[in-house]
Amino acid sequence: TPWLRVVGIGDRGLDGLSKEARELISTAEIVIGGKRHLSLMPKTAQEHIVWPSPISILLNKLTEFRGTKTCVLATGDPMCYGIGASLCKAFPIKEMIILPSPSALSLACARMGWPHQDVELVTLHGRPLAILRGYLQPLAKIVVLSNDENSPREVAELLTEQGFGNSQITVLEHMGGSSERRIEGIARSWNEKPGASFNTIAIEIFSSPETVLMTRHPGLEDD
């Protein structure tokens, strides 16, 4: 039986999980997660450990726990820009059970009515805002995993600077939870106060005649 359980959890906490996922958590001897994740857990005799930083410390700890029933709590889908990728590099998949919850991408597409295949996914977690530039094409639909509560304003400013000030921005906070909130606006006139640090941004790109388009692919333009 795999000793390492990786369970994706959403804003509803245990209430949003399957019976199998709840059992994997409740029967673990050690539960590791972010402060937000652990705050959703009931008080039990289990050892609760807050995710250390950097991630290498967590991987070293998990090596010490090898063979002990250990559950790592992740946000949404652990394999979608989550901890799952690092864990799969560190441990054989046969030693793990990974149970995802809906990802921020899935939830955002459901809220917006956008098919996954029509959407570009960009994460700003620990990445420069400038990476978004290469995705800015007229009528593109982009889901952005925010870095923090300031990301919506920073994205709106970048869009405006790049000539895409007409773009529609929708900020989705706490999707699936009781505090879920949706904020909509236009990039060039965005003046919303920072909200929840945990948010996802859905963008529909609209250009103007003077917009200069960029590409992610290097090279010269055709004559």
Model region roles, listed by residue range:
Residues 1-6, 20, 69-70, 138-223:
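A contiguous loop/helix-start segment that scaffolds small-molecule binding in enzyme catalytic cores
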Residues 49-50, 113-117, 186-189:
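Short, hinge-like loop/turn segments at secondary-structure boundaries
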Residues 51, 99-101, 122-124, 172-174:
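Conserved beta-strand termini and adjacent loop/short-helix elements that scaffold enzyme active sites
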Residues 85, 89, 110, 157, ...:
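Short, well-ordered alpha-helices that flank and scaffold nucleotide-derived cofactor binding pockets
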Residues 89-96, 114-118, 162-167:
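A short alpha->loop->secondary-structure connector
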Residues 106-114, 179-183:
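Glycine-rich, charge-decorated loop segments at or immediately adjacent to ligand/cofactor-binding or catalytic sites
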